[in-house]
């Protein structure tokens, strides 16, 4: 998986390991080092995973770039950086891992997206939300095209989750405001997302593909 160093990512790793998976993290400081904003680095990381571990049965993309910019301030470099990490990197990794999955007639691809795709909370999230929309479209078309090979492609869309990173850009009042809009009146924690990912990687989700699980406390009722 990618993005295993953050609060949500590390919770996903722990959840997968506790479910019996052997987890390999692709990240700047992961078990396999990579700069996901650079295509060559991403492809090299995929090759290293296959060389060192032989196969990938479940691929989770949890890494994300959060560069903030509203329309008036957005520049090409910022937009391209977000797209490189959030959209292109999972494509190159899926491209590398799916041939083996298809050969074994089994594979799971799980993208971590965001509920902000349906209800954008702030103009400065333009690059981030655009990338999550693109990733959602990719998830659906891959679900259709890879299904005949026994590969499912799904996504988890977390809501505002109480993490150190989220606390740097959200006040206590903002956390409370979002929680007030949720059907479930509690703050979301990283294990909420991790549990959804673990389910999608499990035998219990064998009939699911092309679907998004919203782990957002019922903020977006879909």
Segments (PLM) and residue ranges:
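Active-site helix of classical SDR
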Residues: 94, 131, 139
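A conserved structural motif in NAD(P)-dependent oxidoreductases
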Residues: 182-193, 204
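Conserved NAD(P)H cofactor-binding loop of Rossmann-fold oxidoreductase domains
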Residues: 62-67, 217-218
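Substrate-binding pocket helix/loop in short-chain dehydrogenase/reductase
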Residues: 70-71, 78-83, 178
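Short C-terminal tail/terminal secondary-structure segment
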Residues: 119, 198, 209-222
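Alpha-helical segment proximal to the catalytic Tyr-Lys
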Residues: 99, 144-145, 206
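Short, small/polar-rich loop/turn modules that mediate ligand/substrate recognition or access, typified
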Residues: 147-152, 208-210
């Amino acid at each position: 998986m990618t993005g295993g160093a953050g609060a949500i990512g590390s919770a996903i790793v722990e959840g997968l390991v506790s479910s019996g998976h052997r987890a390999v993290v692709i990240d700047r400081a992961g078990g396999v080092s990579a700069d996901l904003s650079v295509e060559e680095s991403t492809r090299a990381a995929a090759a290293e995973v296959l060389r060192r571990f032989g196969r990938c049965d479940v691929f989770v993309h949890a890494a994300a770039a959060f560069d903030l910019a509203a329309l008036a301030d957005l520049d090409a470099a910022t937009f391209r950086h977000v797209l490189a990490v959030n959209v292109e990197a999972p494509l190159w990794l899926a491209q590398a891992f799916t041939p083996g999955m298809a050969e074994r007639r089994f594979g799971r691809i799980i993208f971590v997206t965001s509920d902000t795709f349906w209800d954008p909370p702030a103009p400065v999230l333009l690059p981030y939300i655009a990338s999550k929309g693109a990733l959602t479209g990719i998830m659906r078309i891959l679900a259709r095209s890879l299904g005949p090979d026994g590969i499912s492609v799904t996504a988890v869309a977390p809501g505002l989750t109480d993490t150190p990173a989220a606390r740097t850009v959200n006040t206590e009042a903002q956390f409370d405001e979002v929680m007030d809009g949720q059907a479930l009146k509690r703050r979301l924690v990283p294990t909420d997302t991790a549990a959804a990912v673990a389910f999608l990687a499990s035998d219990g989700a064998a009939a699911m593909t092309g679907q998004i699980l919203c782990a957002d406390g019922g903020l977006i009722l879909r």
